[in-house]
């Protein structure tokens, strides 16, 4: 897995932040896309139609001549699941603008698939953009917005208590 370092080029102004900043938290069930619009973050939830993992609970023998659970490690259902997952990752990748600073976050391997797909799309049109990848558990919307602000150098919002 290749990940951009935090010292790479970051947008300087609020206008750059508004045009280029996006954070994607993704797993097989959904993606949460956090994008700047002026002074606020716009949050979009994308649900997937990826079927759940079907895990065997014990040995299943289909053929007495084949040992330990059957001839193929992947069932037909698992292959279909991966096809659905690839379509979902493509749909999320196509929602991101080409000039945005991208932060991809997730707790499984789906965020790595999204990173690979974004890099593949970038190489097809001979461009490069900053893609920062991090493994993380599920976070609240506020935590995702704060992480995007931190990556873009905007810092947390400060409010005065009382007046």
Protein language model regions, located:
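Terminal alpha-helical anchor/extension segments at protein ends
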Residues: 1-163
């Amino acid at each position: 897995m290749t990940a951009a370092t935090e010292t790479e080029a970051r947008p300087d102004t609020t206008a750059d932040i508004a045009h280029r900043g996006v954070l994607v938290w993704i797993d097989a069930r959904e993606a949460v896309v956090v994008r700047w619009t002026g002074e606020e973050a716009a949050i979009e939830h994308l649900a997937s139609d990826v079927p759940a993992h079907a895990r065997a609970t014990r040995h299943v023998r289909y053929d007495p001549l084949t040992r330990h659970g059957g001839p193929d490690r992947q069932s037909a259902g698992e292959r279909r699941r991966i096809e659905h997952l690839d379509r979902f990752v493509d749909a999320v990748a196509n929602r991101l603008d080409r000039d945005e600073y991208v932060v991809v976050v997730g707790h499984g391997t789906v965020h790595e698939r999204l990173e690979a797909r974004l890099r593949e799309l970038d190489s097809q049109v001979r461009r490069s953009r900053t893609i920062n990848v991090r493994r993380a558990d599920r976070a609240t919307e506020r935590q995702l917005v704060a992480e995007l602000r931190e990556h873009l150098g905007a810092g947390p919002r400060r409010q005065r208590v009382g007046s």
